[in-house]
Design a protein with these regions (language model features):
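Short beta-strand-centered segments at strand-helix junctions
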Residues: 161-163, 278-289, 378-380, 466-468
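Eukaryotic endomembrane system proteins
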Residues: 233-246, 250-328, 332-347, 367-370
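Aspartic protease catalytic domain
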Residues: 2-15, 59-95, 132, 143-145, ...
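Disordered propeptide/prodomain
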Residues: 2-26, 34-37, 43, 47-151, ...
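Charged, amphipathic alpha-helical segments
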Residues: 216-223, 286-291, 401-412
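Conserved catalytic motifs of the protein kinase core domain
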Residues: 148, 275, 364
Length: 542
């Protein structure tokens, strides 16, 4: 694909049929000029692309003419390599820090409404604002010439979005002093508008957009529980990354992606010291980056991550992992999140009673797997028996509730010797074992459970289990959307995995690297801690 072309490319068929409507809301369109996103009230009007802000100046046009050949050659060369694989640098927010239960719970509170609004009632508390960096963040390049952006990698989000030039509230520096950058479409030679008349926008809204005018943008509005909101519009541009060229070797590549351009934010959405440039969504929806790349025939619709719970970082790969071997369980159909059925839970050698009259047949429990959540959240009917069984072998322990939410006790010995492991058994005989050193956290002078009771809210009736990084760390987790399965195996995430190149059939080693925590003027070869590698479908491009 010639990314230097300014003509509109083909629309992606059936592109966003599964996108949750709570995330993207398309207001009535008008033919007014570009909306001032700093004005009030916060009702978004259409964006008109013949507005001065989207019209290059004569100087810009001349400059673009002078660099066209150089950029065209660069993009064309890297486009061929993009069929080998994609590499994004990702790091852990909590790497190098003592595990803090309060820090983890605060992070999960900010995810509450994001999951709640998608049809899952998990009373984690908090406002639901995504104004804090997630567990793992990546560095990517966007535009031509590319600029660098730090984005949260999140399997619970369905779109990629970046703060844009119209956002006056957005911070210039974020987590650990990272230098943040506002995306400006006019600075990119390869950006394209996504209009309200596009198939993309129609599928977001479940049909044609009411009041859509020629050249008006496809808009979105995202609102949170405390009244904060984010307003923006969709664009298409080139996302640049490193591609796998051999064992532990990479080189530049790129691909075109539709993403949200955040133009206005209220409340603390744009002012948090832990903010990032945006979010890189790897959710199940057709709008996620994995679905976009797969719909264009560039990648297999499967990815894997191995999160190093001890050192931070790890591996994040798009493609067919051939080593280690991973067993799998079916994903629950028609679910907005990565969900599977837990059939049994074993604490030590004792099985818990999972029976429920409100959720599905038999004893199985719907369970969400979410790498963006830190802890694990259990229904009250599971939480209390689990905690009681864990401490049953230590009758002298005195349990205390701290800050009205943490179940804690004092203990100075080896937790792995004194307390049992907890094992979740899924369909297809897939098990997931969680050790005491995984589910117990230091908090003040106590040890506290990382298991959280999602039934503390008296209004909650959920029977859903939510498993976050607490159970996923130090495991290779494979998401296979082609076969609608998810699986995992215990693994050393500081080692390597093997990924198949679907073009040549060869197998390449992929391993973790390190990212410095601050600054932006850094070589891309030192910015990789997670590798997002795309292995491409040979029959789709041959």
């Amino acid at each position: 694909m010639d990314h230097t072309s300014k003509t509109k490319g083909p629309l992606l068929p059936n592109f966003l049929s599964t996108l949750p409507h709570r995330l993207i809301t398309q207001p009535n369109q008008s033919s007014s000029p570009f909306h001032d996103f700093t004005s009030t009230p916060p009702s978004p009007a259409s964006l008109h692309f013949n507005s001065p802000i989207f019209t290059p100046t004569m100087t810009t046009c001349i400059s673009l003419l002078l660099i066209t050949l150089l950029i065209s050659a660069s993009v064309a060369a890297s486009s061929d390599d993009s069929f080998r694989g994609a590499v994004f640098g990702v790091n852990s927010k909590f790497s190098g820090k003592e595990r803090s239960l309060s820090l983890f719970k605060a992070h999960d509170n900010l995810r509450h409404l994001q999951i709640l609004a998608s049809g899952v009632d998990l009373p984690l508390g908090g406002t639901g604002r995504p104004d804090a960096v997630g567990l793992y963040y990546a560095k990517i390049g966007i535009g031509t010439p590319p600029k660098e952006y730090y984005v949260q990698v999140d399997t619970g989000s369905d779109i990629m979005w970046i703060n844009c030039i119209q956002c006056r509230e957005c911070p210039k520096r974020g987590y650990h002093g990272l230098e943040l950058t506002l995306y400006d479409p006019e600075d990119s030679f390869t950006w394209k508008p996504v209009t309200c008349a596009s198939e993309f926008c129609a599928e977001i809204n479940g049909g044609a957009v009411t009041g859509c005018k020629p050249n008006a943008s496809c808009l979105y509005t995202e609102t949170y529980g405390d009244g904060s909101y984010s307003i923006g519009y969709f664009v298409m541009d080139v996302v640049q990354y490193d591609s796998v060229s051999g064992d532990l070797e990479t080189k530049l590549a790129n691909g075109s992606v539709i993403f949200g351009c955040g133009a206005r934010q209220s409340g603390n959405l744009g002012t948090s010291e832990e903010a990032l440039d945006g979010i890189l969504g790897f959710g199940k929806s057709n709008s996620s980056i994995i679905s976009q790349l797969a719909s264009s025939g560039k990648v297999k619709k499967m990815f894997a991550h191995c999160l190093d719970g001890d050192n931070g970082g790890g591996i994040f790969a798009i493609g067919h992992v051939v080593q280690p071997k991973v067993n799998s369980t079916p994903l629950i159909p028609d679910e907005p999140h990565y969900s599977a059925n837990v059939m049994k839970i074993e604490v030590g050698t004792q099985f818990l009673n999972l029976s429920t009259s409100t959720h599905g047949p038999g004893d199985k429990r719907r369970t969400i797997i979410d790498s963006g959540t830190t802890l694990a959240y259990l229904p009250d009917a599971i939480y209390k028996p689990m905690v009681n069984e864990i401490v049953a072998g230590q009758p002298d322990l005195r349990l205390r509730t701290l800050h009205d939410q943490y179940t804690c006790f004092k203990y100075s010995g080896s937790v792995d010797d004194a307390f049992p492991a907890v094992t979740f058994y899924f369909e297809n005989s897939l098990s997931l074992k969680v050790y005491p050193h995984d589910y117990l956290f230091a908090f003040e002078d106590f040890l506290c459970f990382g298991w959280q009771n999602n039934g503390l809210d008296s209004l909650s009736t959920t029977d859903t289990i939510l498993l976050g990084d607490l159970v996923l760390s130090n495991k290779l987790v494979l998401y296979d959307l082609e076969n609608q399965t998810i699986g995992w195996t215990e693994y050393n995430c500081s080692s390597t995995i093997k990924l198949r190149d679907e073009i040549t059939g060869s197998v390449h080693l992929v391993g973790p690297h390190s990212i410095p925590s601050g600054g932006r003027r850094m070589s891309s070869r030192y910015l990789i801690s997670f590798l997002l590698i795309t292995a491409l479908l040979h029959h789709m491009i041959s």
